[in-house]
Every structure is written in C-alpha cells, then in structure tokens.
C-alpha cells in the first residue's frame, strides 16, 4: 500500500530511471540464460540509486502498453495493466505475474499485493509484455521481475515531507563480509491524503541474509513484516460530485467507515548452485476490511500462501535448456459480516477456500549462425475447493492447461535484429472473484470460467552506443474474457462474468538516447485497440500512452523532467461513459553533498485535473476517483 507519498517523496529517483539496452544484460525474467531476448521486454534501472524508492507504479509508467492507476487509493493498492491484462483488478494487481528474486509474489489464483516489498532494496526491474504462461503458468498476461541490489556495507537514513501531511522515515543498514552478507530495512509512512477519508499509516521491516556455501553455491534467507493499522477508502464519485468538490469522499464510505487493516509476514529461502536453483516460501496475510454496504460489508480474510520450486539449466554445443517444476497452495479463510454503519453485525458468509497449483515446464533454445529458435511448453493443474460452513455449497473444481510458445530471432548485424513470437496464456478466476456470487448465496459462482488467450508478436530492435530503440506489433485473442460489474442490490461490491471473445492489437515504441555525456532522454509510445466481439473497447484501458524522461547532470546536481500522456478510455462495457485524456509533468532537482543528498520536487506541476482510478461498471455513475493536483515534496538522504 505504498501510494501517493511515494510519488511525492521519491520522484527524484523515479524520473531518473533508465531503460537499458537489451543486449547489455541477460533477462532473468525469461528464465533461460540467453544473451538475446525474443520477446518484448524492458529493463528499468537507475544509474544513480534506487534506494528509498517505494511505489513501483511510478517506476513503470514509461513502459509502453503498461498502464498504472489507483496509486492514491491506499485501500485498493496500485493497479497495473499490461496490454489490458490486469485492468479489471479490484484490489492490487491481477493477471500479471510478479516475482522477487525469482520467487513468486503472485498467489496461485493470480492476485498480487506489493505493500510488503521495500523497493529501496531493488536494483533492477524487468518487465515482459505479452502472454507468458509458457514460462510462469496461470495469470501471466505479463511479467514483472524485481531483482534485489547487491548487498554492500552501508547505512542510509531518509526523511521526507510533502503536501497532504505526508511523512516518511526509512533506515537501511547492511554489512558485507567475505562469506556472509546482511541487510536490514525499516520504513514508516503516514499521510492524510489528498481526498477526505483517504489517509493511511504503515510500517515495514525487511531482513535479508546471503551465505556463500561450498562449490560456488549461495543460500539466501529473507523475512519481511508489514503492518498497516488503517487505510481509508474515499470511494468513487459521480461526475457531478467531482465538479462540486473533487476532494470529497463518498458519503456511504464515511457512513460505513470504509477501509482496511492489514498485517503480513513472509519468509523465503533460495538455494543456487552451478546448474540448479531452488526456492521455498511461506506468507501469512490478515485482512480486515469494511465496505460501504450492509450485507457482507465487513470482511475477515486470513490467507496462508506457500510454495516451492526447483529448476535445472544446461548448455551443450548450440543448445540451451531449462526444466523446472513448481508447486503452490493458497488457503483463504473468508468470513463476511453485516456492516452496520461501521459496526460488525451478523455473519453472512463463512467458508474456507483452497487453490492448489502444480506446474512443470521446459524451455529450449537452438542457435544457428545468426538465427535463434526458442520453444517453451508448460503444463499446469489446479484444484479449487470450497468448504461452506453456513450452507451446503461445498464443492471442488479441477482445471488444467497446456501452454506452448515459440519464437524465432534473427541478428542481421550488431546494430539491428528482429523476432517473431507466438504464445498462449490462461487465467483462472481468483478465489475473490469466485466467492463474489451475484445470486446472493454463499459458495462459488460456478458460472465463471477461465479465460484463454493466444498472441502473435513481431519485434524490431535497433541499438548503437548512444541510442537504442525497439518497435513491437502484437495481436491477441482471448476467449471468455472476465470483467467486473455491480448490482443495484449490492452497490459498491464487484461481481464478475465472462463476456465472450476479445481482441487486443497494437504497436509499441520505446527508445533511449544519450545526447550528451551528462544528458539522457528516454521515451515510449503505445497505441492499441482492446475490443469485445461487438467492437466495444475494454473499460479502463487507454487507447494510447506517451511518456518521456529528460535527465541532465550539472556538477553535483541532477535536473529531471518526466512527462506522461494517457489517452481516452471508457468506464463501462458499453462505452457510454468516456474518460478524458490527461497529461502530467513532474520536475525534480537532486543535489549531492558528500554522503548526503537533498531532493526537491513538484509533481503534476501543471496542476492537471484527472482521475487516479476508474471503478469499472460502477452502479449509480460512481466511476471516478479524482487524482491529486499539484504537490511539492522535500527529501533528505544521509549515508554513513
């Protein structure tokens, strides 16, 4: 639930993030250790420092076809959509696989919350656009892979203040010895929020330990604790209410005390040898939420999520390969109560939901002269079970999928290459989506089916010493697309249905130009159509996006300008409610002095009025969550 404060306090680093040339590094997100990338990919890094950057959405806004929203709603979390996948998310990220050092953060049913990850420890972020179920299985409409920065001996303290009573304190201490490296991060944030009833407070602790073993093996053990005692939800407004007072909260959200309390523990371990990599993890998350309606308006959700995986890689002559197996389980204990104006009432739902996943995959790559042929095949089995303690709707559902992909890459010269790729994807309904039964009864909505997709992609890459660019065309078909809707009898609650076949087609352009020793410009543009069988555009997916980042070093200071243009989109399935285009610009100045740094900046310097989030198909026209206007911030970082 890192949100608006992160944009205030850490934009000085966000706008300095750069897109590396794809031939400079090996993408860990593609699993195979190859020096070519026959797929649309972007690597976000920072030549200065990613320390104390917390809001992942701000780091990713320059990536084509990737749309970030709900960055200022501390209850619903940042939402990220890649080529339209993830746009329907109600809370957090949906339909996109997220990894931290190779360990899945995404649950088996396809949901992701990033509030427990201290991005101050992240060194690079890799993003794969397009279907990736052949690599990662369920709900892989794209991949976001977070890689931790190497642990070195250092101590950092950062203090930040900003508009809307934003406060942040972060401390990091790390020690690197010959065969052991340790890092500890503590962060605390608090903010009143731009809108009424939109504040939050949270604390995070992260511990990382890395051991060097025999035979060049390494063992990593990580633990994180996250606690948010409160995060309030201001709710969606009608356009009339926005025009009257864009800072106001929806009255029902005030009446029902809408918001949440979250606590999470996560423990993970990774073992890497020359040819083998294995991992295991366990996560415990407790959510107590209050929604703005009576029946089922209070939620007590206890989630246990755990898994393990192992993979082996090898090479011989002109072949590369990797084979692996992964297993994960998700146990949700879901209880709902009446919400009597913020007070807990009678129990309306009590059920245990289980999601078990087992997958095996293989990836091979064959090289011949300037050609590369890569294939991937993955098989997944899922079992979903429900135990209903209030009624007789106990049951189970078994799902399976086989996901192939193939890509051909051609290196025409050291400056120019191209590729063509075909891949598949599948996405099961999440436990939250299944448990939202529009009949009003307990149990799952058994009418909801998985969505399945296939995609063709053509890419062209050009790279020189001071300039690189890529151009990508994609075409995707999806069957049984899942979208949310609301009912008059349950206003504010999302239900889900399959709407039939959809198509996604578009073009993506991105580039990086070092126009001087001290100056750099990155840019990206994407344009696409995301349509149903009736030629209606999918809601909350912009038709086009354009972003630039201009960075200039002047002595010990850095001036950065980040601009973002987001095209028009729709708030409903029938395309009767248009959401207008908007443009924003952020300016940041950073000055380094010895081991300290001072950052001063202004976000949304043009004072643009736009919407941070759109509630898809909201009943009563309450689609709109206004974004903050102009904001100033100050941050001080001291290193020892």
Spans of model-derived segments:
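N-terminal periplasmic "start-of-domain" segments of outer-membrane beta-barrel proteins
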Residues: 23-51, 76-81, 96
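Gram-negative outer-membrane beta-barrel transporters
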Residues: 315-318, 367, 474-477, 495-572, ...
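C-terminal beta-signal and adjacent terminal beta-strands/loops
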Residues: 479, 565-570, 590-640
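Transmembrane beta-barrel wall of Gram-negative outer-membrane proteins
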Residues: 163-190, 195-233, 258-274, 314-316, ...
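Short strand-turn segments of transmembrane beta-barrel domains in outer membranes
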Residues: 124, 131-133, 143, 147-175, ...
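Outer membrane beta-barrel strand-and-loop segments of large Gram-negative receptors
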Residues: 301-312, 355-361, 445-449, 455, ...
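Short acidic/polar hinge/loop motifs at secondary-structure boundaries
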Residues: 96, 103-129
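Surface-exposed extracellular loop regions of Gram-negative outer-membrane beta-barrel proteins
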Residues: 240, 329-340, 381-388, 396, ...
